[in-house]
Amino acid sequence: AKKIAAMAQSMDLSATQAAEMGESFQLMGVQTDKMEEHILETYKSSQAMGLNATKVIKVLQQSMKSMQSYSFAGGVKGMTSMAQQAVKMRLDVDDVLQMADKFYQPEAAIEAAANLQMLGGDIADAFGDPFETMYLARNKPEELAKKLGDMTENMMTFNEETGEYEFPAEVRMQLKSAGEQLGINTDKM
């Protein structure tokens, strides 16, 4: 209990949030000592990625119950990867899980992939294979989130005048159409 309280304080979680997180970890077979190690590892890897590590921990804590109903490669590590991707892309984990739901059934995956292939480019490359996407949705939703992140990164261009990355107008239109097929609100990205 002392370790959980200390962790809660250092991660800016309430005692209740930390206890709920501890329960979720225990339901997955992760004991308190291992939980502490995992949280510290998550904190360090999130910082190394340039992310707000405390926010990643909070997203993990808030989304753990919904993520437990999916198969993640590597268990808690896969869930952590999903939380990191969500923070990186400014998406809710639930949005990414909705995308996984959309590709869960073969018919829906084939139809969505066909529509995404028509958009071409990075979108077709990322989500054009319905069976790969369906496999990821069923077994590795964190990889599905990574694909989404990689796709959007490849679509950005660097504006040398402003020194910022941006989406050209045609790319924004493609993203909007892709978002409709993926079941994701691209305005949040």
Predicted regions and their residues:
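Amphipathic alpha-helical interface segments used for oligomerization, scaffolding
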Residues: 1-189
